[in-house]
Amino acid sequence: MPKQITSWSFSRYAVYRECPLKAKLKFIDKLEEPGNEAMARGNRIHKAAEQFIKGELKTLPPELNKVASILRYLKGRYKKITSGMVVEDTWAFTKTWTKTVWNDWAACWVRIKVDVAHRREGKEKVLIITDWKTGKFREEKNDEYVEQLELYALAALQLYPDLDYVEPQLCYTDQGMFWPKDGDPIRFTHQDLPVLQKLWEKRVKSMLNDTTFTPKPNNNCRYCHYRKSNGGPCQY
């Protein structure tokens, strides 16, 4: 059994940052966490959005009514061969940021799940990446949101050298809102690529080098499946 984390994703990085021990128990020891209704609902909504865009679902479920306009637009774009759209895809890279496939177990270093990405209509070559969120938008998590957008941008710029820029965004389906807000996008160009690569290499370095996985008590411990009071292996 491996004693270190050898590959990563944004969600794996987020869990490690919350608590190294939780990351070990979940990703190395493979101690499975039970599902919950919020996760099941999120999966259902993501699947419904995918099916609607692809034309496999004719009617939107009520949970997606607040983002109906963007979904109808994406559905129309999906029909066009030139749209350059991907829906529910996984982008994967090696340690040198070379493109690979998600199931390259020997060399894949990072996996990035993409809900939908499409090219904007017009002369400029712009890729819009949209991540569906079923939870609530929280202002205090802005730093985390920016990190996620940076990773999307890094991957897109690496994959598509012809792009003028990338505009990643989060879409909160329950609230019908986008972050960043409409008209105020965060843009990334190819000049940002080497900076983003170094930034993410630095961010994940401690996670990939960790061999002790010290627990990190915090406010989320009360919800953790591995907590002591739940009969878990954690001391807290």
Task: Name each region found by the language model.
Residues 38, 145-149, 193, 197:
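Short, charged, low-complexity patches
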Residues 5-58, 88-89, 223:
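Nuclease catalytic cores
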Residues 5-18, 107-119, 188-193:
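An acidic intrinsically disordered interaction segment
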Residues 35-41, 138-146:
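Active-site metal-coordination segments of metallo-dependent hydrolases
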Residues 3-4, 21-32, 129, 133, ...:
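Short amphipathic alpha-helical segments and their helix-coil junctions
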Residues 44, 147-155:
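Short amphipathic alpha-helical face segments that pack within enzyme cores
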Residues 48-138, 147, 161-169, 173-176:
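Catalytic cores of nuclease domains that cleave nucleic-acid phosphodiester backbones
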Residues 7-8, 89, 96, 139-142, ...:
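Metal-dependent nuclease catalytic regions and adjoining charged, substrate-binding loops involved
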